[in-house]
From Swiss-Prot:
Keywords: ATP-binding, Hydrolase, Magnesium, Metal-binding, Multifunctional enzyme, Nickel, Nucleotide-binding, Nucleotidyltransferase, RNA repair, RNA-binding, Transferase, tRNA processing. Gene3D superfamilies: Beta Polymerase, domain 2, cca-adding enzyme, domain 2. A single active site specifically recognizes both ATP and CTP and is responsible for their addition. Its cofactor is Mg(2+); Ni(2+). The lineage of its organism: Bacteria, Pseudomonadati, Pseudomonadota, Gammaproteobacteria, Vibrionales. GO terms for molecular function: ATP binding; CCA tRNA nucleotidyltransferase activity; cyclic-nucleotide phosphodiesterase activity; magnesium ion binding; phosphatase activity; tRNA binding. ATP binds at residues 8, 11, 91, 137, 140. InterPro entries: CCA_bact, HD/PDEase_dom, HD_domain, NT_sf, PolA_pol_head_dom, PolyA_RNA-bd, tRNA_CCA-adding_enzyme. CDD domains: HDc, NT_ClassII-CCAase. Signal peptide: none annotated. GO terms for biological process: RNA repair; tRNA 3'-terminal CCA addition. This is Multifunctional CCA protein. Belongs to the tRNA nucleotidyltransferase/poly(A) polymerase family. Bacterial CCA-adding enzyme type 1 subfamily. CTP binds at residues 8, 11, 91, 137, 140.
Length: 407
């Protein structure tokens, strides 16, 4: 029985990245042997065990044979005669198929170290095409390691296209699609996840609402990049620069979905996209099972971003109406991420990335003034019932007028 450190821990140490999780592969053992050593069985689909002391995962070396459709359509063989090289062969990318022995020796039968040096994401074998989840995983790794210069090998991109054409991606569950998308949001370049899926054709299958944005024109006066899909990628990049918050990054990526259904006769204008996008975001979030906090923020950004961009033109009562709809009186923490998304939208335009966004400060100032109007003061003044809300709004409007010098 031999134990090796494998996968991401070996890869990240070679990239001088802090290793957070360690996975181990055990060669020459059995479930009975692992049980006798005190390891706890946790794997349902194949033999995986938790170390009783470290709680790290130890998996028996195994091979996989395609036996059905989708990423679960595999038959596993995990007997003691499975070699380390056979176990590494089933892995997705060469950079993830390096093992380390307890003496520090690296076992690298598929040249993963060279691909790390060359900054290349390359499949281990043609068995890559047996698992549709690997398309999303490669896109996520492309996003995660983009800042280090990694790109997808042309031959791997070809196999990703083969997988897409096979129809296998339709068997991915909503949970797995969201899991990979959500992980990509935490990378320095989440837009690369989307652009990689677009390049191989997978975006049209797993996230058709986003795919529909590519090729849709916008007014060149406001959007020198013209293409709404390109704009969306730029906004995703800007949001990642502005915020570490994942719901904020998600909302920025989907804020313009309504432009994908604008009638061609109305191009390049998209006057109703803030309205039409709401239905699309709801449908997308329901299908992919996006958490409610992500969904709620995305809907607010979609509905209000155009008005926020027009902050300099808004009347005081319009500010109050927007704040009412956002429910920021009860949930003031909502305002900051909404404004950050709008700032990312503003900056996600070709050649205008560093242009100031005074609208953000104007909205912040308006809210600071309005929130200082106290309900108790309105009640103390003798207002009752429905009069309270009406008077509260009036006082808030006056506060915004005074703060922003609106006549």
């Amino acid at each position: 029985m031999k134990i090796y450190l494998v996968g991401g821990a070996v890869r990240d140490s070679l990239l001088n990245i802090d290793v957070k999780d360690k996975d181990w592969v055990v060669v020459g053992s059995t479930p009975q042997k692992m049980d006798s050593l005190g390891y706890q069985t946790v794997g349902q689909d194949f033999p995986v065990f938790l170390n009783p002391k470290t709680k790290e995962e130890y998996a028996l070396a195994r091979t996989e044979r395609k036996s059905g459709q989708g990423y679960k359509g595999f038959t596993c063989y995990a007997e003691p005669d499975v070699t380390l090289e056979e176990d590494l062969l089933r892995r997705d990318l060469t950079i993830n198929a390096i093992a380390q022995a307890d003496n520090g020796e690296l076992i690298d039968p598929y040249n993963g170290q060279q691909d790390i040096i060359d900054r290349t994401l390359r499949h281990v074998s043609d068995a890559f095409t047996e698992d549709p989840l690997r398309v999303l995983r490669v896109a996520r790794f492309a996003a995660r390691f983009h800042h280090l210069g990694f790109t997808v090998a042309p031959e791997t991109m070809h196999l990703m296209k083969v997988l897409v054409d096979s129809g296998e991606l339709s068997h991915l569950t909503a949970e797995r699609v969201w899991q990979e998308w959500q992980k990509s949001l935490s990378s320095q370049h989440p837009e690369i996840f989307l652009s990689t899926l677009k390049e191989c054709g997978a975006l049209a299958i797993v996230l058709p609402e986003l795919n529909a944005l590519f090729g849709i024109p916008q007014p060149e006066k406001w959007h020198p990049e013209i293409d709404t899909g390109i704009h969306t990628l730029m906004v995703a990049q800007q949001a990642a620069l502005l915020s570490q918050d994942l719901p904020t990054r998600f909302a920025a990526q989907v804020h313009d979905l309504g432009k994908g259904v604008t009638p061609e006769s109305e191009w390049p204008s998209h006057k109703l996209h803030c309205h039409t996008g709401i239905k699309l975001i709801k449908r997308l979030c329901d299908r992919v099972r996006v958490p409610n906090d992500y969904r709620d923020l995305a809907l607010l950004v979609c509905e209000h971003h155009s008005n926020i961009h027009r902050a300099a033109e808004l009347r005081a009562q319009t500010f109050i109406k927007i704040f009412d709809k956002m429910d920021v009186w009860r949930k003031p923490e909502r305002l900051a991420p909404i404004l950050l998304c709008c700032q990312a939208d503003h900056a996600g335009r070709l050649g205008l990335e560093t242009q100031p966004y005074p609208q953000k400060k104007r909205f912040e100032a308006a809210f600071d003034a309005a929130k200082n109007v106290e309900v108790k003061d309105v009640v103390a003044a003798g207002f009752k019932g429905p009069e309270i809300r009406e008077e509260l709004s009036k006082r808030r409007i006056e506060a915004v007028k005074d703060k922003l010098n609106i006549k």
